[in-house]
Every structure is written in structure tokens, then in C-alpha cells.
Amino acid sequence: MVTAKMVKELRERTGAGMMDCKKALTETDGDMEKAVEFLREKGLAAAAKKAGRVAAEGLVTTYLSEDNKTAVALEVNCETDFVSINESFVEFTNSIAKQIATSDVKDVEELLESKYIADENVTVKEALTALIAKIGENMNIRRFEKLTIDNGVINGYVHGEGRIGVLVELGCEKESDILMPLAKDIAMQVAAANPLFLDETSVDEEALDKEREIYRAQALNEGKPEKIVEKMVEGRVKKYLKEVCLIDQVWVKNSDYTIKKLLEEKSKEVGSPITLCKFVRFERGEGLEKKEENFAEEVQRQMNQK
């Protein structure tokens, strides 16, 4: 059964009209992902809106070691934006990011059982439980990623008071003052342009085949002759790759440059090749469903806690 809530979610994810969303869900027996594909094939949904919508509160933060060789991106979730800017919550999140960077923990489960860096008398799990009791709101250490490099640097960028956090790893045999600002610029690019892949070699073939099928269906629905459909599909695939591969994206600070061209020019300045090794991009609440609440009731609940 197709519900109003399902139609609302599909509209938010695709930007398509209400009746189109209802039809898509009906045609796909209520399967949300298939409904998104259905709308795209009909040309009714933008490819850029395919990713899961952001619907949870919390904080994304980054931590960089003093030598810029180790870095961490971390997401900690909470229920409301009031808590995401709470001083105790922010301090806890920053402490956890530092703890991950300075320890060998491999995942969230191992992290929770380890001694808390700010108070070794308790575990991270116990510290989190105490913070939940103090603030009166559920919290969760959702995910983290740690990067390390020997030859090169790592820099980060946090956007929108912890809404998006990015790390960029640049490899280079020579040390240079150019590297850190360059990594920061590319991190800002990642935050703004949201690339899905580093370059074409890292593109998931299954995902690419899916895009081809969608473009093929779009072309056929437009009434294009079969003989030119394949050319159209490949043209759209090339455009898609330039949009989703970081190395091929147009630089947001100067449209005369792609990221590849920017790296080539900076490599000449440094006198040694600069390699874009990896990037990490966390967006707060990606793929999480936020419980819908009356705003006035939420404010009242926060006031009652004071």
C-alpha cells in the first residue's frame, strides 16, 4: 500500500511531482529505490538527487595530527539540533576524534569498549551513557574513518557547523608549504561538489551499468532512434563521470581548471608530482530517518530540561 509518507519521501528525494511519485510507487509495489529509478527513466527525477536524503541531527568533525600525517573524520548523532551545539556534546565529539587518531581502534564497537581519553576510569561507552543521562537525549557514535600517510599531507574542512566533514590525502615526495593549502582547497571542492569517486578507475562498474540502463531508457522514452541511442548513452556516461569523479571535476574556485589540471600546475611549482590519494566525505545524517516532531513541542521539551 502506498502511503502519503512514502510519497512525501520520494518527492523530497527526487523533486518529482506528487502524482508522478504516487504512480512510481504504485508501479514498483512501494519499493522506494525502484521508484527512484522509475522516475529517472521517465526523466522526472534528477540524477543528483538519487542519494539518500539527510534527516538526522548531530555533528561531523575532523581531527588532524600536528605533523599532518594522520587525520580522522567522525560522525556522532543526536536527536535535535539544540544538542548538536551543546558544549558538552561538542567536547565529547572532539575528544573521541582525537582518541581515534592516537589509538589503534578499528571500528565503533572496539572504540566503545576502549578507555575514554578524557577520563581513563571509564570506557567510551560509559562516558557516552553518562552524557546521554546528563543531556537527556539519545546519542550514537555512528562512524569514523582514519587516514595516515608517510610521504605527503592530509588536510580537512568542516562546513556548516559540523554538517559536512571532509579529509583529503595528497601524496608527494617533497615537503612544501603549497601542499596543505592545496589539500584544503580540494577538501572544500569535495564538500561543495560531492564527488562519488576519486577517478574513473575507482568507479563501481555495477553502478556505471545501472546509469547506462537509466540513460538508455531515457533516450528510448524520448523517442530517439535505436541506432543513435548508444551514442547518446555513452555521451551521457562521459558527462556523468566528469560530474562524479573528483579528479575530472571543474574546480569550484576557478572554472578554468579541473582538479587534475590544478594538481599538474601545483606539481610544477613544488618540483615533484602531487598525487590525489584519497578523500573522505561525511554528511551529517546521511541515510538516517529523523523522527518527525512538532517544533513548538520540541522547544518546550528543551526548555523543560533547563
From Swiss-Prot:
It is found in: Cytoplasm. CDD domains: UBA_EF-Ts. The keyword Oxidoreductase does not apply. The keyword Cytoplasm applies. One of its GO terms (cellular component) is cytoplasm. One of its GO terms (molecular function) is translation elongation factor activity. Keywords: Cytoplasm, Elongation factor, Protein biosynthesis. Residues 80-83 are annotated as: Involved in Mg(2+) ion dislocation from EF-Tu. Associates with the EF-Tu.GDP complex and induces the exchange of GDP to GTP. It remains bound to the aminoacyl-tRNA.EF-Tu.GTP complex up to the GTP hydrolysis stage on the ribosome. Belongs to the EF-Ts family. NCBIfam families: tsf. This is Elongation factor Ts. It comes from Clostridium novyi (strain NT). The gene is tsf.
